[in-house]
Curated annotation (Swiss-Prot):
One Pfam family hit: Molybdopterin
GO terms under cellular component: membrane; nitrate reductase complex; periplasmic space
Domain of life: Bacteria
Lineage, broadest ranks: Bacteria, Pseudomonadati, Campylobacterota, Epsilonproteobacteria, Campylobacterales
Gene: napA
Sites where the protein binds substrate: 892
HAMAP family on file: Nitrate_reduct_NapA
A biological-process GO annotation: Mo-molybdopterin cofactor biosynthetic process
Protein name per Swiss-Prot or TrEMBL: Periplasmic nitrate reductase
Reactions mediated catalytically: 2 Fe(II)-[cytochrome] + nitrate + 2 H(+) = 2 Fe(III)-[cytochrome] + nitrite + H2O
Cofactor note: Binds 1 [4Fe-4S] cluster. Binds 1 molybdenum-bis(molybdopterin guanine dinucleotide) (Mo-bis-MGD) cofactor per subunit.
Length: 926
């Protein structure tokens, strides 16, 4: 029986059984094949949708995966990647043992070749290199590059190890690359992170607008729900796709708007202008007056490039773009949009607020209205039209139709976005603008209406953001530079007062730059591939390989980061360990370990706990110099007063304390399931001490979860207990009195909103930046701060050009991203034969007119070259992605088409998130 027949037979067999019909012989064969299978629920490994899956195991191996029909997110449906959750674990080149660069004597040698070593030797060398850097450069000389794919307990362990143990805030996730702009948008607008709505909005709305979000490929299960909603009432339900190139999402759209890179800023202001100037009666005045204030901030904020515009390691070709960090000559469009600052086209704007880019202040509605004045339909269409072949009048008609959909009375609207907004030199601004329009119309925090940021990774919300694995964060939206937040954290973690470091570490891109500068010399990479996923990659590869730096990569496969590393630690994959993820709608889901890791691979939690055994309090809690101005005080005497000994290890204090050991190993939830960290396992892995690892003897995952949830209880981030999540298909926080929350800030649904404003409809109860000075469009005029109790902010933000635009030498825009069949850098999905065969290489999607001008044919190889580097790729003129003239699209999943050698490491100056969506390139035949 082949695979297709088996699947058909299995489905028919199940149908017959449920109907009480006798099962035919061929169907019985399928049922027979399933004998001895154990099915258990889990979460999908891939995107931020958070699909539920069912995993079948037999004889210690995963034998099948299917969609979970009881999962409310996907209702039994999986995308193509979801069906291969098992196969990602069984690639032929899976790393099964620690690998260290050594010389002929077997000693560590940075110029040596990788050789299999024991866990003990791996940790011995790792410890020595860590101590060397820690002693030389202090807590911020060492760093961890973490992930939005960490399980929640993994991220919590990493944050606790670094911040409480090593007193270092230099831990940042790859979610910096995908969600930081959304996070800062939430914090600046609402005073608290994460969406107000939920996926139920899809079935309740009349209008779905995708902004820089190719949902058909990047969130295919959500797109299936969107498609179902559209088809349920095609005349009423409208779909709009706004993008810089045509995608599969356009296939369902009633309106497709192809706009010029960064022109989303202008389009949002055009919609707001239409509301304020031409349809003032549609402003929800009661909502705005009660629940919002108008704000703005500086425009001269730079582009997140190095402050040293003549940096010695820049290529000469990089200097022109680098110079924009200091100043920029304004374009014709910017002369119009920045006229409120007294500037005009041709003026040089000095970027004086690069260090204070996030500052903002209260302005009047009249000032807000004045700022919107330039964004007429004529001006916006001229700036925003992204397809040179499109008729300007047709484009204007689309913009007008888009505005009309938002403005229409009683029409519910959901705005979805992902990387097109977030990976943006003004990513924070454009996130804020989405809320601007929804607030003006009173279409936010309502069933079926709201601006909704979609996450790309499976736990960018649940781990990176909620746990606080960013350089500046602590759990539950707390931050390291707030003394009260440090005090709360120290109490929960049972640390001496003053242990936590109040100075944020280096964010993801800054950590790479610090590595190049010798300010960071030790980096531990977990659950991501930074040397493939970071823009302007040539710089960082040289820093890793050519300097006195030590790179540890925990990875199941030999991706680019593993190849540039000095030490590779073999890591257990998703169903080889216990875990939890938190998705884009605040839904938290847990799963059990289904099978043992392969070879000697071990879970990330085990790796961190074993590493923590090697450091005593006297090594890390004494006086530590951070920089020339700041020295962390010794807390050893205070630790002794708490009953600790300076000979105690970080493992003893942080992870194997009395509370941890109170969670017994005989918990019923573990019955008949493996738990490598708790019990060890039958592989008999020789651990970091040279002895067989036989487990910690207590339920470490449950301890980590129950301690972590203490941070959010009573603070609007309430999570359920560990056992509850193993009984349900996820819950959306805050979970209060056993009930999840669908719509935040709405007193009908959110108990925290009801508590904050019992007699009102809404309460925006976030408390970050909840008091502001006042001013006008040019700046602060009254420094006295006014409290903003239960209010959100409506920001004005201007249109500005990107810092690098096409020129005669580099005439094309380059945009990067993903494709349906592959995940991120492809280290997992490129090892699944079916996915590899479907899309074996990254292509350069190009318009036929551009190809004709270059003399390039379908499937020919071209060079794609920027000021920073070049790569070769095969041209596709007829594929799924259809760029306009002047733009090319190249996905980044293929290490053989290493497109991040070409991209620009410019970031949003507020969020520090990289803009992968726009830089200038030239293309020519290879």
């Amino acid at each position: 029986m082949n695979r297709r027949d088996f699947i058909k037979s299995a489905a028919a067999s199940a149908a017959c059984a449920s109907a009480g019909i006798a099962i035919p012989a061929n169907l019985s064969a399928a049922s027979e094949a399933e004998k001895g299978w154990r099915w258990d629920k889990a979460a999908c490994r891939f995107c931020g949708t958070g699909c539920g899956i069912m995993v079948a195991t037999k004889e210690g191996k995963i034998v099948a995966v299917k969609g979970d029909p009881e999962a409310p997110v996907n209702r039994g449906l999986n995308c193509i990647k979801g069906y291969f959750n098992a196969k990602i674990m069984y690639g032929e080149d899976r790393i099964t043992h620690p690998l260290l660069r050594v010389n002929e004597k077997g000693e560590f040698d940075k110029k040596g070749k990788f050789k299999q070593v024991s866990w003990k030797q791996a940790f011995d060398v790792m410890e020595a290199q860590f101590r060397k850097t820690y002693d030389e450069l202090g807590p911020h000389g060492v760093g961890v590059l973490g992930s939005g794919q960490y399980t929640i307990p993994e991220g919590y362990t990493a944050a606790k190890m670094m911040k409480a143990g090593f007193r270092s805030n230099s831990i940042d996730p790859n979610a910096r690359h995908c969600m930081a702009s959304a996070v800062v948008g939430f914090i600046q607008v609402f005073g608290i992170d994460e969406p107000s709505g939920c996926f139920d909005d899809i079935e309740l709305t009349d209008t779905i607008v995708a902004w820089g979000a190719n949902m058909a490929e990047m969130h295919p299960i959500l797109w299936a729900r969107v498609s179902d909603r559209k088809l349920s009432n095609p005349d009423r339900v409208k779909v709009v796709n706004l993008s810089t190139y045509s995608t599969r999402t356009s296939n369902l759209a009633d309106i497709e708007i192809i706009f010029a890179p960064s022109a989303d800023l202008a389009i949002w202001n055009y919609i707001a202008r239409e509301i304020v100037y031409n349809h003032p009666e549609m402003i929800d005045e009661e909502f705005v007056k009660k629940h919002c204030i108008f704000t703005t901030g500086p425009a001269d904020i730079g582009y997140g490039l190095r402050p040293d515009i003549k940096y010695k390691k820049y290529l000469s070709s990089e200097l022109d773009t680098a110079a924009t960090e200091k100043s920029k000559v304004l374009s014709e469009a910017e002369g119009v949009t920045l006229s409120y600052l007294g500037l005009k086209a041709g003026d040089t704007m000095e970027n004086k607020n690069t260090a204070t880019a996030g500052n903002h202040w209260h302005i009047s509605f009249e000032e807000f209205k004045k700022a919107l004045a330039p964004y007429t339909l004529e001006f916006t269409a001229k700036v925003a039209k992204g397809d040179p072949n499109e008729d300007i009048e047709e484009f204007k008609g689309k913009l007008k139709a888009l505005a009309d959909l938002y403005i229409e009375k009683n029409r519910k609207v959901v705005s979805f976005w992902t990387m097109g907004f977030n990976q943006h030199q003004r990513g924070t601004w454009v996130n804020e603008q989405a809320y601007m329009v929804h607030f003006l119309l009173g279409k936010q925090a309502l069933p079926g209406s709201g601006a909704f940021s979609l996450t790309g990774q499976p736990s960018a919300c649940g781990t990176a953001r909620e746990v606080g694995t960013f350089v500046h964060r602590l759990p539950a939206d707390m931050v390291v530079n707030n003394p009260k937040h440090r005090e709360i954290s120290e109490k929960i973690w049972k640390l001496p007062a003053g242990t936590l470091n109040g100075i944020p570490g280096s964010h993801y891109v800054k950590m790479m730059r610090d590595l190049e500068d010798g300010k960071v010399k030790f980096i531990w990479v977990q659950v991501n591939n930074p040397w493939q996923n970071t823009a302007n990659a040539n710089h960082w590869i040289k820093a890793a390989r050519e300097m006195d730096n030590f790179i540890v990569v925990s990875d199941p496969y030999p991706g680019i980061s593993a190849k540039v590393a000095d030490l590779i630690l073999p890591t257990a994959m998703i169903y080889e360990k216990w875990g939890a993820y938190g998705n884009a709608e605040r839904r938290t889901q847990h799963w059990r370990q289904q099978v043992l890791p392969v070879g000697e691979a071990m879970p990330d939690i085990w790796q961190m706990l074993e590493f923590s055994k090697r450091f005593k309090l006297k090594d890390v809690w004494g006086e530590k110099k951070l920089n020339d101005k700041v020295t962390l005080p010794s807390v050893l005497d205070a630790a002794k007063a708490m009953g600790y000994s300076e000979e105690d290890t970080l493992f003893d204090v942080l992870f194997a304390n009395e509370e941890a050991k109170s969670y017994p190993a005989n918990d019923p939830i573990m019955e008949n399931f493996d738990n490598t960290e708790v019990f060890g396992d039958k592989r008999g892995v020789i651990g970091s001490d040279g002895k067989e690892f036989k487990g910690y003897g207590f339920f470490v995952h449950k301890y980590l979860w129950e301690e972590y949830r203490k941070f959010g209880l009573g603070h609007g981030h309430d999570l359920a207990d560990f056992d509850t999540y193993h009984r349900v298909r996820g819950l959306r926080w805050p979970v209060v009195d056993g009930k999840e929350t669908q719509w935040r800030f709405n007193t009908k649904f959110d108990p925290y909103a009801k508590k904050a404003a019992p007699n009102d409809k809404f309460a925006f109860y976030g408390n970050k930046a909840a008091a502001l000075p006042s001013g006008d469009l040019k700046g602060v005029t009254d420094k006295e701060k006014t409290p903003l109790t239960n209010k959100a902010k409506i920001f004005f933000r201007p249109y500005m050009d990107p810092c690098e635009m096409p020129s005669s030498e580099y005439p094309f825009w380059l945009c990067t991203g993903r494709v349906l069949e592959h995940w991120h850098s492809g280290t997992m999905t490129m090892r699944v034969p079916e996915l590899y065969r479907a899309v074996p290489e990254a292509l350069c999607y190009m318009h036929e007119q551009d190809a004709a001008k270059l003399g390039v044919l379908q499937n020919e190889i071209v060079w794609i070259e920027s000021r920073r580097g070049k790569v070769k790729a095969r041209v596709d003129l007829k594929g799924r992605n259809k760029p306009p003239v002047g733009l090319v699209y190249v996905p980044w999943f293929d290490e053989n088409v290493f497109i991040n050698k070409v991209t620009l490491d410019s970031t949003c100056p507020i969020s520090k998130e990289t803009d992968y969506k726009k830089c200038a390139v030239k293309i020519y035949k290879a």
